[in-house]
């Protein structure tokens, strides 16, 4: 039966999103300290650039400035490499959610005629219609996709040659997160769970 297949697909998708959201949150939690470390390093590197080395006692140590720069740059590159690994984790979640949501949408397209428009639009007193649940799943997929893209673009702009931008990374990241609230995912999953629990798809 189309309705039973649809319910099974929705249930599997909800479980997949819940699993992937936990992985997403774990990856995101690692970003703030790494970006904070990069911001701190950038501040130190800018301060070292401004320092009048020749007119200070440190000027007696001819290679100190270059050694310090290499050490700081190496630390920045190591933090960026770690962030790259975390970004790969975000990409894996994005892809897994896209696959799960895509499977549900394809099934609906295949079985839409059999399900009928009335079934797709029928709502319970406390749960959404199937059409609303499908729209919510697309919102979830879009949330992960857009936030992943923002994280990718943020890291692409980072360079030891642009220390002011690197120093502002923690604030830039916070502004991004403010635009992508995690409750977008939670609310949609709760609504989908209600739909399944109250057997609006049966």
Language-model-detected regions and their locations in the chain:
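N-terminal alpha-helical scaffolding segments that mark the starts
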Residues: 1-44, 202
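Extended, amphipathic alpha-helical coiled-coil scaffold segments used for oligomerization/tethering
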Residues: 4-11, 35-139, 164
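Intrinsically disordered, low-complexity regions enriched in Ser/Pro/Gly/Gln/His and often acidic
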Residues: 17, 24, 62, 164-166, ...
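Charged, alpha-helical coiled-coil and adjacent rod-like segments in eukaryotic scaffold subunits
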Residues: 99-202
């Amino acid at each position: 039966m189309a309705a039973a297949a649809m319910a099974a697909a929705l249930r599997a998708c909800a479980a997949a999103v819940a699993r992937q959201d936990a992985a997403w949150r774990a990856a995101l939690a690692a970003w703030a300290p790494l970006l904070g470390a990069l911001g701190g390093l950038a501040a130190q590197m800018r301060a070292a650039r401004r320092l009048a080395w020749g007119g200070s006692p440190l000027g007696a140590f001819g290679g100190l400035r270059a050694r310090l720069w290499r050490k700081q740059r190496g630390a920045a590159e190591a933090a960026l490499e770690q962030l790259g690994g975390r970004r790969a984790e975000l990409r894996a979640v994005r892809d897994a959610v896209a696959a799960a949501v895509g499977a549900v949408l394809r099934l609906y397209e295949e079985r839409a005629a059999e399900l009928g428009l009335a079934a797709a639009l029928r709502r319970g007193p406390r749960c959404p219609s199937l059409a609303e649940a499908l729209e919510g799943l697309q919102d979830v997929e879009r949330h992960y996709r857009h936030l992943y893209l923002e994280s990718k673009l943020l890291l692409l702009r980072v360079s030891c040659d642009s220390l002011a931008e690197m120093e502002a990374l923690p604030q830039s990241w916070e502004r991004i997160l403010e635009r992508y609230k995690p409750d977008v995912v939670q609310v949609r999953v709760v609504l989908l769970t209600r739909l399944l629990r109250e057997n609006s798809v049966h």
